[in-house]
Amino acid sequence: MGTASSLVSPGEVIEDAYGGEGGEACEIPVEVKPKARLLRSSFRRGPRVIGASFKSTGSVELEYAAEYERLRKDYEIFRVSKNNEITSMQKKEAKLDEENKRLRAELQALQKTYQKILREKESALEAKYQAMERAATFEHDRDKVKRQFKIFRETKEKEIQDLLRAKRDLESKLQQLQAQGIQIYDPADSDSDDNHTTVTTAGTQCEYWSGGVLGSEPSMGSMMQLQQTHRGPEFAHSLIDVEGPFANVSRDDWDAAVASLLQVSPHVSQSLWSNTVRCYLIYTHETKAELQTFIQTYSLRLRRFCEGLGHFYLNVSFPEEKAAVFAAERRREMERSSVCVLLLKSSVSSCVVEDVEEAFVKTPDARPLLLYLRTADRKGEKEEVSTLSPATRDLLERVNKADRSAKLKVVDHAGSVEEGAALIFSQLERIIKQELLGLELEENGVVEEREEEDSGDVLWDLHDEQEQIEAFQQACGAAARFSFQKYVDRLNDMVAAPPPTPPLLVSGAPGSGKSLLLAKWIELQQKHSPNTLILYHFTGRPLSTSTDPVLIIKRLTVKLLQHFWSISGLSMDPSKILEEFPRWLERLSARHHGNIIIIIDSIDQIQNAERHMKWLIDPLPANVRVLVSVNVETCPQAWRLWPTLHLDPLNPREVKSVISTECVSVDIKLSKDQEKKLEKHCRSAATCNALYVSLLARLITHFSTSWTLDRTLQQCVMCQDTVSLYRLGLKVALDSLNSDQEKHIMKELLCLVCASHNGISESEVLELFPDLTFPALISMLHNLERLLIITYACGLIRFQHSQACEGVNQEFLDGDKCRGSYREKCIRFFSQQLEQDRVTWRVADELPWLLQQQEDRSKLQMSLLNLFVSQNLYKRGHFSELLAYWQFVGKDKCSMATEYFDALKEFEKTCESEQSMSRLANLYETLGRFLKDLGLLSQAVAPLQRSLEIRETALDPDHPSVAQSLHQLAGVYVHWRKFGNAEQLYKQAMEICENAYGPEHSTVARELDSLSLLYQKQNKYEQAEKLRKRSVKIRQKTARQKGHMYGFALLKRRALQLEELTLGKDSTDCAKTLNELGVLYYLQNNLDAAKLFLTRSLEMRQRVLGPDHPDCAQSLNNLAALHSERKEYESAEELYERALDIRKRALAPDHPSLAYTLKHLAMLYKRRGKLEKAVPLYELALEIREKSFGPKHPSVATALVNLAVLYCQLKQHSDALPLYERALKVYEDSLGRLHPRVGETLKNLAVLSYEEGDFEKAAELYKRAMEIKEAEPSLVCGKAPSRHSSSGDTFSMRSPALPNASR
């Protein structure tokens, strides 16, 4: 570094650049700072003389000094800058230290705060747990106090009833004493009719429960026993007045009609035997071609059609050459057949004549009949007619003569075989649709009707109901073999005990006859107490559908809801179903004018019975009784404290009677030695068991070529219990078969039944075993049924008893070790149906359950993702079962939703036709409802919107199914509390329904109720009440046409069957049936038919019982109601007056039926403007109420209000005022100051004060009335049954509002 001068050696002389003189040499101090010019001079150009001057000799040090200075200067600058940086960094460091200290302090503060919060959280959690414990304790104490209060209340009510009864007894004795001493006794005032039929005084304990169950059946009018609960008759009657359509038909008539029409009685046969359309085909060898063509070409179409509606279809035919061998089977199948088809040409065989004689001649009205007569080709038709054999001509003449009602349908065909088969199919399809299933024949009418039925908010399974009906019928039939007289008497005594009463326990060993006793008792109750509502359930094999507690309670709840205006408020949540059943029971018990009995057979077989039946331990309402039967060995300990009726083994006399009766029925006589042998054998409890003795009798009387009577008897006495006897029965049944193939099939059949969920059907058996002929199957099943091994339930082959299943398990399945292989066989069978797109209720019931039992989770998930399987389960109300399957697979709610969405998207890609798009829309709607029930509201919107879009696009924006989608979507928004969106959708749905069906259709009423509930949630009570009233009016009108009950199609068919029962001689039973038919047709708004039957009933009762019998008053009352409905008030008035006159003379002065007639006659007088004539009737009704219930009962207040209203209409305000004031005091004392009845009475008083000019008082009273209305909106506008209900779109489920006092 430096300048060029640094290169000059020391001692050299450098010429002065300025030309100065030379001088002395001197040393330049290092400190001297050379000038910049000196440094720059070394770079100047030009010739210079370099000398060894003084300046040149000091230039090196000068250059170094300059360089040094420059470096020092740079260093100083660098040093200063670095010092500055260090100072800055120190300041930053100090600042960061301060920040660090601050943050450390904050951290310490936060840690302290965190510790404090943690301690507070722990203390809060501890307080929470303590609060929960206190709440649980409080809830337990509350429930205990509630139960104690309930017991106290009901005990006091019972005491009041007893006091009233004692009072009336004393009055009766006093009258008798007066009659003896003063002779003022008038027989016309007696409580007995001309036939000396006792009518129980109102309010006695016998009015709760009929004691005379075993006596001869009295006529309906002479044994009316209407229960008088603490609410009084006015509540029930006022409900009738509001609810109409049977506003003027007396409640005892309605209850009797419902009891005999809804509850299936054994003596009335069903149109379909065990849910199967059995087509009995009679043919000759000449018409065999038509039969084969029909079976091969058209039979499958009928089967698929019936399967789609939940029924089985079966062709029943016996080959002509083997028909004589199966004579017993032919008779049996003829009785079970739903429709009979005869195919004739020219000649007939003896077997054909026998079948035709049985079906077409002896019982032509028992089933629809179809005659196919094959003539020759058209060219030779005349010649062929003349070639009919004499036997054929005679047979046709007898058939024609027997067809008095012209029900026989004839197909006369002269064309080809294929055309003939097509004609048979066409007529048979029409018969099945119209006469057997009650469907309309309009184009696409059937499908639309089914969809409309499915669109309801309550989903339930017809097959469960059918199964229970058949179980009851079979138990009734089997009970006839035993004498249960002593047990029936004891049951009557236990049931008639004063409330509160815990459930009654019927215990016994398996097979002791518990089910038979309960069925017999139910049958007697239905016969003698038509006003009693009986709900029963018979459980089947363990793990079957009939043992599912959720399905059981749901079915019973639906049966309860039949007696409300709607059945659409039922939650789908399993826990809510179990929780809400006691509430519904209590609500119905408070309004039902009669008794309620719940009977559950084999309750210990129900899955987790003790946990799911907790409601049994709570006190029951006063008019409710519960009977349950249990196996004495498996009865829970907590239930053993209940009142118990134990069934003992049969005594020797009963054993001998059962065996003797069975032997006499088949014409077998036992020798003395054989009788002694049996008597010696049947001495232990196991061998005197009712089922054991019954099976023993069947085995002894069983016909078999390889088993003699002695051999059978010898083998039987070696069996010491029922299961071993069943195993012997299986061996006997096997040995009775002809071939090894049939024996193998029978083993396989029984093993498949054992492995299945609910059993298998006959048509499924024929599919599983193609080599098996129908006659061989029927013969095999007949033998097994006679040996008490199998039975039929809803078209399925099942075991009659659990011991039979255990016998098969031990004999054929090696103690359950081989059951898995048979389940796999069932899985393959139903999976094959699934692959063929045959998704029936059977596939949905069996396949998922079988896969679950086999623990095949992957295949189970695949079956559930078949959208039609899940849809079938969901739409039949098996929501809990569907959830259980998904839980078994290991999926939560969100995963289920995702899986279904993906499956639906895949299915949507394959949809092209209009029909497939309609099915897709149904699937989306089902998924939306399913997700809504799961509580996934946000995810439920998308499928419902997609369903709406598809229906609007594929069908029509104004199609009724679009309204259904709108309704369901609005329901989700209601749950979501998006009321504005919901209101818009409900209104749009209502507009579509009004355009499609008219303004008075049930779907319009549904939308009105939904809107009413919506307005109620928004506190718009006036709008809600207005819509609710409009809905009630619509339902009153449509109820006449739909019968109010969900089983209306069944009622319609029952009406035809009841008509057949009225064709016999005059009798009280026949007259009773005629009256019930009249009531039924009245409810259907078929007033002409109703008048015909009611008139016939009246005339028959007058002939049989006399014109002054109470039953005649009943018929007169109903005829009066009919004339009143037709606006024929003059005739109605005359009939009511005649009925009142009879009941005044025949019944007690305070009998409810008398009060009923008084009330309706008074209402008729008011309607006709005859107010003066109505006054004494209302006064008499008031007097009856006061005598029956005392002056402080709410029903007395209602009578006071009605009389006061009448006085107001007569402008007798001074007479009306004290009645209103007295009624107001009674209402306030008995119902509370905020009850709606108090508000209604205050409103009436306000109107009265206003009319008298006392405006200030009127304003005050009206203000109080409005305060009550606002305080109790749920009582005015209706209230949903549960805030946890899964359906926010449902309307009010409460009883209809009580009528205003101004009524």
From Swiss-Prot:
Region Disordered, as annotated, extends over 1276-1303
Q: What does the UniProt entry say about where the protein is found? A: Cell projection, Cilium
Could you mention a single GO BP entry for this protein? heart jogging
Transport in keyword set: no
Q: Where is the composition biased (Polar residues)?
A: 1283-1293
* SUPFAM superfamilies from the UniProt entry: P-loop containing nucleoside triphosphate hydrolases, TPR-like
Q: Which residues form a coiled coil?
A: 81-183
The main location class comes to other
Does the keyword Coiled coil feature in the UniProt annotation? yes
Instruction: Report, from the record, the phenotype seen after gene disruption.
Output: Morpholino knockdown of the protein in the embryo causes ventral body curvature, pronephric cyst formation and laterality defects, including reversed heart looping.
Pfam families given in the database record: NPHP3, NPHP3_hel, NPHP3_N, TPR_12, TPR_7, TPR_NPHP3
Q: Which GO terms describe its cellular component?
A: ciliary base; ciliary inversin compartment; cilium
List the keywords (alphabetical).
Answer: Cell projection, Cilium, Coiled coil, Repeat, TPR repeat, Wnt signaling pathway
Q: Where are the TPR repeats?
A: 449-482, 802-840, 921-954, 963-996, 1005-1038, 1071-1104, 1113-1146, 1155-1188, 1197-1230, 1239-1272
The task this protein performs is described as: Required for normal ciliary development and function. Inhibits disheveled-1-induced canonical Wnt-signaling activity and may also play a role in the control of non-canonical Wnt signaling that regulates planar cell polarity. Probably acts as a molecular switch between different Wnt signaling pathways. Required for proper convergent extension cell movements.
Protein name (database record): Nephrocystin-3
Q: Which organism is it from?
A: Danio rerio (Zebrafish)
